[in-house]
Amino acid sequence: MFENLSSKIEKALHTLRGKGSITDINVAETVKEVRKALLDADVSYPIAKEFTDKVKAEAMGRNVIQSIEPGQLMVKIVHEKLTELMGSSAVDINIKGNPAVILIAGLQGSGKTTFSAKLAYHLKNKRAKNVMLVAGDIYRPAAISQLQTLGQQIQVPVYTEEGNNNPVKIAHNAIAEARQKGVNVVIVDTAGRLAVDEDMMNEISALKRELQPQETLFVVDSMTGQDAVNTAKAFNDRIDYDGVVLTKLDGDTRGGAALTIRYTVEKPIKFVGVGEKMDALDVFHPDRMANRILGMGDVVSLVERAQEQYDEAEARKIQKKLIHNEYNFEDFLSQIAQIKKMGSMKDLVGMIPGMDKLTKNVEISDDAFKPIEAIIGSMTPYERRNPQCLNGSRKQRIAAGSGRSIQELNRFLKQFDDTRKMMKMVSKGNTKMPIRKRR
């Protein structure tokens, strides 16, 4: 996420490291490089210039405390201004209503239908809401079919009306049914177009006027950069939406849309899509995003994800097994499954401070666990539960079954043993596991 932008800003700020003081010359040099980094990220020139002018004015107006290097001070100032540019703080969606209606708008291909399902999953599992999805795209049968498939996947009902070509009536009927069934939140997916056109704008305007939704969200593909910003402005001018959703952020190396949409349309970014899975949706926190852009990671989000997947009973069971030397390959496989539920490996690594530098030339892939899973999958149930039983002949069979060499198998067994020893030390040193579920 934002790899190009991060590396260029970091390089720009590096020019102040080792300097004894802040001067007009070194600040001007740093600010110039930051501006170039923003322009390369597809940030418009007026916004990039205003941003760097603010950074420069702030830097020249501060006295450097003796214990703080000029480089550190500049990082702090850039972090503050990035956070401010993206909205300062997270803004929640309004789900107060009987039921609350959320209208989803955006161009075709922006990820609107997938986001609708992700939002339903988010509200159902993280906010304990009873949710209904409404298939309001009457022009594309594939969109209705996609929403029904996603609804089944996340176990959320999808309201459809075959033969009804009036999206306003479909939505009204869905809301009436939702009210009867005690549904808390109705999410209305709407038709998109390949480009902004008058018919589309008239339809989405009519839906907003007739439904009076508690929340209208505009969904845009972050990878389209400045085009995303222009489209966001065109929609906002017509329907005055409440917030923006940036999809495909995990594949965006530049970050121009994330940096400038809020400034341009004066509406907050509320959610970001960070993967294909239904739980790959994050509430947008400007300060955390600024951390990631500056290579400082996002430990808070990492801990939150860990807490969501954390099973206290399972953790206590594993802790007990570690103390009694009973930790086995089945337990290891179970923990891998928990890690995979937290998100893509690339995204998780990006949340750890400093890891972006260490893994700069390393290919981070979700396939990293596949060799381990293949090795453990080639063991018998007895072998998975009893690691100490693996003799030469068993190893030969497991290696052949998993398609790995004996050397690779032995390397994994050593890593497993080292991991088990380390976890045992941690477990003995703490009577409680390090992460506890929030109450």
What are these model-derived regions, one by one?
Residues A171-I175, R179, V183, A195, ...:
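Conserved phosphate-handling catalytic cores of large alpha/beta enzymes
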Residues F2-K19, R288-R439:
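Long amphipathic alpha-helical segments used for membrane anchoring, targeting, substrate engagement
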Residues L16, D42, V78, L107, ...:
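Residue-level signature of catalytic and energy-coupling elements of molecular machines
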Residues I9-G136, A143-N164, A171-T190:
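Primarily NTPase-proximal linker/entry elements flanking Walker-type ATP/GTP-binding cores
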